[in-house]
C-alpha cells in the first residue's frame, strides 16, 4: 500500500494503472477511520481494481464555531486500518497541496445545498462539492463511494456528477452501526461517556418511526412528533432538525403515500452534532 501526499505523485501512479486498463475506485474521507469507512473501502474493492482512499480534513466545509480545530486526526491508525482492508493507495494531502492559495472557485448544487442540514450549516455543502470536484479531477475514478449516513451529501454529489458530466459512478453504502445501534462516526470519539450512552436514542427513535410508517401511518406531522417526543425523553439530546423527505428528491412531505422516504436527524450531545437517517419504502418490513 502506498501513502501519497502530492497530486503529481498520485497522478503518475494512477496513469500507470489506467494504461493497464485498471478500474479505479475512490473513497473520500476526512480520516479518523472506523468500520463505516472500511465498509466503503470494501465496496470499492469489490467494484474496482485499484482502491484510492483520500484523507483530507477539508477546511472550507466547516463554518465559524464548528469543530475544524478539534476534528479528530490519527494518520498512523488510519494507515494500519487501510492496510488491513485492501486499500491500495492512501492520498493524504496537506491543506497547502489542495489549496495552495486562497480558493476563488467553488462548486455548488444550489437548491439542494441550502435545505435540511444546509439550513443550519450555510456553505457547508458548497465546501463538500468543491472538494469532491477537485478529487474527481485529481483521481479521475471510475467509481466513487459514499456512505448513506451523510444522506443529503450523497444526493447532492449524485446531482453534481450528473450535472457536470463526470464519468464516475456514485455508489452509496448502507450505514454501519455499533452493536447498540449508534451509527459509526468519527465524531463519536468526542462524546462523553454519558453522551455516548444517550446517543442510542437516535437509532431507537428512527426504528420506532419506521415501524409506525410500515403499520400504515401516513401523516408526517404525527411521525415527526413521535420522533421528537422520543428524543426529548433523553435529557442530554438537543434536537437540531427532524426532516421527513422524498428519498431521491429531498422534497419535504406532509403525507406519506407510496413514495420511498428518508427520515433525517441532526441532534446535539454537548458540543457534538450527530446525524442519522432511516430509509423507508412502502414494501419494506420493520426490522
From Swiss-Prot:
Keyword Ligase among record annotations: yes
Main location: cytoplasm
One Pfam family named in its UniProt record: Pantoate_ligase
GO molecular function: ATP binding; pantoate-beta-alanine ligase activity
Protein known as: Pantothenate synthetase
Ligand binding (ATP): 30-37, 147-150, 176, 184-187
Function per UniProt: Catalyzes the condensation of pantoate with beta-alanine in an ATP-dependent reaction via a pantoyl-adenylate intermediate.
Catalysis: reaction(s): (R)-pantoate + beta-alanine + ATP = (R)-pantothenate + AMP + diphosphate + H(+)
Record-listed (R)-pantoate binding positions: 61, 153
Gene3D superfamilies: HUPs (3.40.50.620), Pantoate-beta-alanine ligase, C-terminal domain (3.30.1300.10)
Amino acid at each position: 500500500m502506498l501513502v501519497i501526499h502530492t497530486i503529481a505523485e498520485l497522478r503518475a501512479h494512477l496513469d500507470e494503472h489506467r494504461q493497464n486498463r485498471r478500474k479505479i475506485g475512490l473513497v473520500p474521507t476526512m480520516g479518523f477511520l472506523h468500520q463505516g469507512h472500511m465498509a466503503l473501502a470494501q465496496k470499492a474493492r469489490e467494484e474496482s481494481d485499484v482502491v484510492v482512499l483520500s484523507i483530507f480534513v477539508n477546511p472550507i466545509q466547516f463554518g465559524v464555531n464548528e469543530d475544524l480545530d478539534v476534528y479528530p486526526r490519527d494518520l498512523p491508525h488510519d494507515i494500519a486500518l487501510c492496510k488491513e482492508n485492501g486499500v491500495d493507495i492512501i492520498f493524504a494531502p496537506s491543506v497547502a497541496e489542495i489549496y495552495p492559495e486562497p480558493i476563488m472557485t467553488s462548486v455548488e448544487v444550489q437548491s439542494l445545498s441550502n435545505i435540511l442540514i444546509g439550513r443550519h450549516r450555510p456553505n457547508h455543502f458548497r465546501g463538500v462539492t468543491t472538494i469532491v470536484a477537485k478529487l474527481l479531477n485529481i483521481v479521475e475514478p471510475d467509481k466513487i463511494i459514499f456512505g448513506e449516513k451523510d444522506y443529503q451529501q450523497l444526493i447532492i454529489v449524485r446531482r453534481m456528477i450528473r450535472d457536470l458530466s463526470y464519468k464516475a459512478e456514485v455508489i452509496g453504502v448502507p450505514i454501519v452501526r455499533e452493536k447498540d445501534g449508534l451509527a459509526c462516526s468519527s465524531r463519536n470519539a468526542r462524546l462523553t461517556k454519558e453522551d455516548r450512552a444517550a446517543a442510542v436514542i437516535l437509532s431507537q427513535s428512527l426504528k420506532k418511526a419506521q415501524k409506525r410508517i410500515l403499520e400504515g401511518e401516513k401523516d408526517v406531522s404525527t411521525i415527526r412528533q413521535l420522533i421528537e417526543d422520543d428524543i426529548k425523553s433523553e435529557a442530554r439530546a438537543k434536537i437540531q432538525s427532524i426532516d421527513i423527505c422524498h428519498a431521491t428528491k429531498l422534497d419535504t412531505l406532509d403525507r406519506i403515500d407510496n413514495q420511498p422516504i428518508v427520515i433525517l436527524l441532526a441532534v446535539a450531545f454537548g458540543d457534538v452534532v450527530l446525524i442519522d437517517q432511516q430509509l423507508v419504502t412502502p414494501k419494506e418490513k420493520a426490522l
